[in-house]
């Protein structure tokens, strides 16, 4: 945010360019959604429930959101965002792995799809 507010391009701060402002707005939205998903999943687990569906949903949503956020930060900073002189490059590298830890995103989505199909079958048997 500091970079986007201070860096000038075409006579105005980067953040005042619609494309950059929209990316930063999306980052804020993604962060809040990730926070809410984590809180929701934790509340389910706090009841003593297994929370397998909820944790899969949260894992996918949060890891995908973090990757989008990091990618947007690199994009806003341009070549500077890929420099090892900034924390953005390190965060980008590290959050990419979140989409693989504890099962890749696709495995969690596949598991959720199987549960959706099973629920549909049960609902339509009666």
Language-model region placement:
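Alpha-helical interface subdomain recognition
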Residues: 1-126
């Amino acid at each position: 945010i500091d970079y986007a507010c201070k860096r000038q391009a075409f006579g105005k701060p980067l953040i005042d360019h619609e494309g950059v402002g929209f990316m930063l707005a999306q980052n804020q939205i993604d962060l809040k959604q990730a926070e809410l998903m984590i809180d929701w999943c934790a509340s389910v687990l706090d009841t003593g429930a297994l929370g397998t569906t909820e944790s899969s949903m949260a894992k996918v949503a949060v890891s995908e959101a973090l990757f989008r956020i990091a990618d947007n930060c690199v994009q806003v900073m341009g070549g500077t965002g890929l420099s090892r002189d900034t924390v953005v490059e390190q965060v980008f590298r590290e959050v990419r792995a979140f989409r693989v830890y504890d099962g890749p995103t696709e495995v969690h989505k596949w598991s959720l799809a199987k549960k959706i199909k099973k629920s549909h079958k049960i609902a339509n048997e009666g």
